[in-house]
C-alpha cells in the first residue's frame, strides 16, 4: 500500500503508462504480423509494402521507450532479409 501522496501518484501514472505502452506494443505487433502474413503468402510486393509500413512503427517504439533499440534492429534486419529472399 502506498503511504505517501507521491507513491499514490506514481501508481496512478504507472497504470496509465502501462495501458499506453501496451497499446503501442500491440500496434507494433500488428504491423509485424502483416509482414509475416505477406511473407507466408509468398507475395513479395505486399511483404515489401508491409515492411515499409512496419519500419517507422518499430522505430517509434524505440523512440517512445517501449522496445530496446537492439531488439528493433534485430527484428528489422530479419524481416528485411526474409523479404529480400522472396
UniProtKB/Swiss-Prot annotation:
* Secretion signal span: none
**What superkingdom heads the lineage?**
Bacteria
InterPro entries attached to this UniProt entry:
Ribosomal_bS20 (IPR002583), Ribosomal_bS20_sf (IPR036510)
- Report whether rRNA-binding shows up as a keyword of the record: yes
Q: Which GO terms describe its molecular function?
A: small ribosomal subunit rRNA binding; structural constituent of ribosome
One Gene Ontology cellular component term attached to this UniProt record is: small ribosomal subunit
Return the Pfam families for the record. Ribosomal_S20p
Q: Name a biological process GO annotation.
A: translation
Keywords (alphabetical) are: Ribonucleoprotein, Ribosomal protein, RNA-binding, rRNA-binding
Alphabetical list of PANTHER family matching this protein: 30S RIBOSOMAL PROTEIN S20 (PTHR33398), SMALL RIBOSOMAL SUBUNIT PROTEIN BS20C (PTHR33398:SF1)
As for what it does, the entry says:
Binds directly to 16S ribosomal RNA.
Q: Which family does it belong to?
A: Belongs to the bacterial ribosomal protein bS20 family.
Q: This protein is called what?
A: Small ribosomal subunit protein bS20
State which gene encodes it. Answer: rpsT
Amino acid at each position: 500500500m502506498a503511504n505517501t501522496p507521491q507513491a499514490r501518484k506514481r501508481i496512478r501514472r504507472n497504470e496509465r503508462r502501462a495501458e499506453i505502452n501496451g497499446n503501442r506494443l500491440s500496434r507494433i505487433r500488428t504491423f509485424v504480423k502483416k509482414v509475416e502474413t505477406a511473407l507466408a503468402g509468398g507475395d513479395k510486393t505486399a511483404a515489401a509494402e508491409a515492411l515499409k509500413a512496419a519500419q517507422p512503427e518499430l522505430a517509434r517504439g524505440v523512440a517512445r521507450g517501449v522496445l530496446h533499440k537492439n531488439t528493433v534492429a534485430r527484428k528489422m534486419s530479419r524481416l528485411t532479409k526474409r523479404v529480400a529472399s522472396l
